[in-house]
A protein has these predicted regions:
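Generic short N-terminal amphipathic or hydrophobic helices
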Residues: 7-8, 13
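N-terminal signal peptide c-region/cleavage motif recognized by signal peptidases
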Residues: 15-17
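Bacterial N-terminal signal peptides that target proteins for export
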Residues: 1-7
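Subset of outer-membrane beta-barrel
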Residues: 21-358
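Nuclease and nuclease-like effector domains acting on nucleic acids or nucleotide cofactors
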Residues: 10, 19-20
Length: 358
C-alpha cells in the first residue's frame, strides 16, 4: 500500500517537472499573495506545520489535524486601498482520518472610470458618458486530506476553479490542481511539500469585440493588439521544515524554514535556467497558547538597479495573534521599512473553531 502511494507522489513530481519545461506563461498571480495573517507574519513559511482551516491554501495535507469545524476570514488592501483582497474558508473533519475544506478568494479593484465614451460623435467632451466598472479575480478551491497508513504521514489535494472578470470587456474561466504531503517524526520535527498548479492551471479568455473596439479606437496607434486568449500558470513547489520548542510549560517557540521553487529563471536569490529558489524563514513565540508574536523574512530578490548592478533585497514581516476559547484574531504587517519592491499591507484575519459552540 505504501509503495502505491510513493509511486503516485513520484509520478506527480515527474509530471510537474516535465510540464514546467514547456510552459512559459504566468497568470493568476493573485493566488500567490497568501491567506491568514498568522502565516503572513511568518513570511509564509508554514507549509510543514499548517494544521487548521487555512491549510486548504498552504498545504491541504494539514487539514487532517482538525478536531472540529473551523471558519476563517481575511481582509487586506493594496495600492493605497485601491485594490481589496478578501478570503473566506470553511473546513470540517469527516472522521479521524480525513477532512474537507472549501475556500473563496477575491482580489479586485472596483469603481474604475470607463472613459472610452468620454468624447461623443461630435468631438465634444461629455462627462455624463463616463461610467464605472470593476475588475476582479476569484478562486474557489475544494480541498480533501487523508492520513496514510504510515504514522505521521498525510496527503491532501486541491481542485480550484478560477474566474477573472474585467468589466464587460473580457472574462475567463480556469481550472487547476494542487497536491501536498506532511510528515511528523516521533521527535516532533515536521516536513511538508506543496506542489501548486501541477497540471499547469490555465485560463481561457473571451472578449467583447465591441467593447475592445472602443478601446482600440480611443487613441490612434495605441491599444491595437488583442491579448492572447489562453494563459498558463507554471507549476511551483514549496518545501518546508519546522519544529516547536516548549519552555517551562507556558512558553513556546515555533521555527520554520521554507524553500519556494518556480520552474523558471527569475530574479530570486538562487536562479538558474531550470528553476529559481526563494527561501523564507519564520518564527512564532507563544505564551500559554494565548498570545503570539511572529516575525519572518522572505522574498529574497536580486533587484536590478539603475546602474545595472544588483542589490539583494528581502521582505520582512511582523505579526501579532490572540487566541481565546476557539477564537483567534491575527494581524500581520508585511515588508517592514519597504525593504523590497513587493506588495505590503496591514492584514487582519479571524478564525473561529466551532468547538466553542459545543
Amino acid at each position: 500500500m505504501l509503495l502505491k502511494y510513493h509511486a503516485i507522489i513520484v509520478f506527480a513530481l515527474i509530471s510537474l517537472l516535465s510540464t514546467a519545461q514547456t510552459t512559459r506563461k504566468y497568470s493568476n498571480e493573485f493566488l500567490n499573495i497568501g491567506v491568514d495573517a498568522a502565516a503572513l507574519g511568518m513570511s509564509n513559511a508554514v507549509v510543514s506545520h499548517t494544521a487548521d482551516v487555512n491549510s486548504g491554501y498552504w498545504n491541504p495535507a494539514g487539514l487532517v489535524n482538525l478536531e472540529d469545524s473551523q471558519l476563517a476570514l481575511l481582509h487586506s488592501s493594496y495600492f493605497a486601498n485601491i485594490a481589496n483582497y478578501n478570503y473566506i474558508a470553511f473546513a470540517k473533519p469527516l472522521d479521524d482520518q480525513s477532512a474537507v475544506a472549501l475556500s473563496l478568494i477575491r482580489f479586485g479593484v472596483d469603481d474604475i472610470l470607463d472613459t472610452t465614451q468620454l468624447i461623443d460623435d461630435q468631438g465634444n467632451i461629455n462627462y455624463d458618458r463616463v461610467s464605472l466598472f470593476s475588475t476582479a479575480d476569484y478562486a474557489l478551491t475544494f480541498s480533501y486530506a487523508r492520513r496514510l497508513p504510515l504514522d505521521g504521514l498525510s496527503y491532501g489535494v486541491n481542485a480550484k476553479v478560477v474566474r477573472r472578470i474585467i468589466g464587460d470587456f473580457a472574462s475567463s474561466w480556469g481550472f487547476g490542481l494542487d497536491a501536498g504531503i506532511q510528515f511528523e517524526t516521533k521527535n516532533d520535527w515536521k516536513f511538508g511539500i506543496m506542489a501548486r498548479d501541477i497540471t499547469t492551471t490555465f485560463n481561457a479568455w473571451t472578449f467583447d469585440d465591441d467593447k475592445l473596439a472602443d478601446i482600440q479606437n480611443a487613441v490612434e496607434g495605441q491599444n491595437q493588439t488583442v491579448p492572447e486568449s489562453t494563459e498558463l500558470t507554471i507549476p511551483k513547489l514549496q518545501i518546508g521544515l519546522s519544529k516547536k520548542f516548549v519552555f517551562h510549560y507556558d512558553y513556546s517557540l515555533l521555527t520554520s524554514f521554507d524553500l519556494n521553487m518556480r520552474f523558471a529563471e527569475t530574479n530570486d536569490v538562487i536562479s538558474t535556467s531550470f528553476a529559481s529558489i526563494n527561501p523564507a524563514l519564520g518564527f512564532e513565540f507563544g505564551y500559554t497558547d494565548l498570545v503570539f508574536l511572529r516575525a519572518g523574512a522572505g522574498n529574497f530578490q536580486n533587484e536590478l538597479q539603475l546602474d545595472n548592478s544588483e542589490n539583494l533585497t528581502f521582505q520582512p514581516s511582523f505579526g501579532l495573534g490572540f487566541k481565546y476559547r476557539g477564537i483567534a484574531i491575527d494581524y500581520a504587517f508585511t515588508d517592514i521599512g519597504d525593504q523590497s519592491a513587493a506588495l505590503y499591507s496591514n492584514v487582519f484575519s479571524l478564525k473561529i473553531d466551532f468547538s466553542i459552540f459545543r
